[in-house]
A protein has these predicted regions:
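A short, N-terminal "cap"/entry segment at the start of jelly-roll beta-barrel domains
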Residues: 2-55, 96, 103-104, 122, ...
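Histidine-centered metal-chelating micro-motifs
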Residues: 66-68, 86, 101-103, 107-116
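Glycine- and acidic-residue-biased ligand/ion/polar-headgroup-sensing regions
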Residues: 73-92, 99-101
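A short beta-loop-beta micro-motif enriched in histidine and acidic residues
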Residues: 52, 64-77
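Ligand-binding loop in jelly-roll beta-barrel domains
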Residues: 93-94, 107-136
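Sec/Tat-exported extracytoplasmic proteins
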Residues: 58, 63-65, 81-84, 89, ...
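Short acidic-glycine-tyrosine-enriched beta hairpin
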Residues: 61, 90-109
Length: 142
């Protein structure tokens, strides 16, 4: 039993070392502005009589960057490409999403925090919105 526990500890240590070695190299230029680039917007075929649209945005927050409180009237699935995203939706605990991690946001959740967790490096993520055709992707919250 002790040998099995020891092998597990060694395997975990080796995996951690490999994962650290495979991290992306830090960026040499620092982007201090928030950038949003539409990657895709495609109307989907009607399903059960509902017309939907999927839109993919690439969002970049510069070091210390963030957005103001807002909500999305549609489902959002996101994936962090680089850096660490700090997020807090009303009624939920604050969360950190690192490069390679994904997140889900229910429609109309109020985003109290959407920010770069770093003061040195930008964070970049893809946000996949699935909405009604006429729905705006984001609405400011006073």
């Amino acid at each position: 039993m002790m040998a099995q526990v020891r092998r597990t500890e060694i395997a975990a240590a080796l995996l951690g070392t490999v994962m650290m070695a495979c991290r992306p190299a830090p960026r040499t230029s620092i982007d201090t502005e928030t950038q949003v680039r539409k990657v895709l917007s495609q109307t989907l075929p009607a399903m059960d009589g509902r017309g939907l649209r999927v839109t993919v945005l690439e969002v970049t927050y510069g070091p210390g960057g963030s957005s103001r409180p807002h909500r999305h009237p549609c489902v959002v699935v996101g994936s962090v490409i680089a850096g660490t995203l700090r997020s807090r939706v009303q009624g939920e605990p604050e969360a950190l999403y690192r490069a390679g991690e994904s997140f889900y946001e229910a429609p109309n959740g109020v985003h109290l925090v959407s920010a770069n967790a770093s003061d040195r490096d930008p964070v970049r993520f893809l946000a996949y919105f699935t909405c009604d055709h006429d729905a705006p992707l984001s609405e400011a919250v006073p």
